[in-house]
Amino acid sequence: MTPKLKPMDDLRRVMARLRGVDGCPWDLEQDHKSIRFNAVEEVYELVDAIEADDDVEMLEELGDLLLQVVFHAQIAEERGAFDFDRVAQGITEKLIRRHPHVFGTAKVKDVGGVWKQWDAIKQVEKTGKTNERKSAFDGIPRHLPALMRAHELVKKARNQGLLPKGRKCRAKRKLGEEMFRLVQKAQANGWQAEALLRVETKRCEKVLRKKEKARQLTPRA
């Protein structure tokens, strides 16, 4: 009798079987690029479940998202690149490294301090690597939706002191209404709000990168 495996081990075994010699024809045809957008779709379905406060759906969608991780790890293992254990080990070590105020002796005053520390450690980690990030903005995914990309750009710029902190807005609904009105205005003119924001975000990113570079070149007193 086959000993009962832990659920995670069981999932990995099933995935390996699907990709085996006598596995599923569809699974065998896939590679990293052919399924790259599946993870994006699963994330949005998970967000829907979270916003609906639906635990049953959330449980299922978390499983679907986990499948994408296991699928990519299996393909990578077949290529001799890395396996799931390396993925799990990597993120575990990263969490410990990036939280020295929890696992070490570092001190931070608030959430803002946590983010600054995170970015500083991240920059050190990337130094010397083939994909070394020379800018704080290099890590923003190009395929993020325009609004999410703009949000990340502003957040990183403020963490770097390249943009003012800005005033707090207590009227969350009012801000949402203003944003929706802008979408209506764009649609009335035959423009895609997503495309407009993407272009403007790209323009602002160029300006911020220039400011960042100029500051890096300025000798410190």
Task: Name each model feature, range by range.
Residues M1-E61, L67-A221:
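Flexible "arm" and connector segments at domain edges
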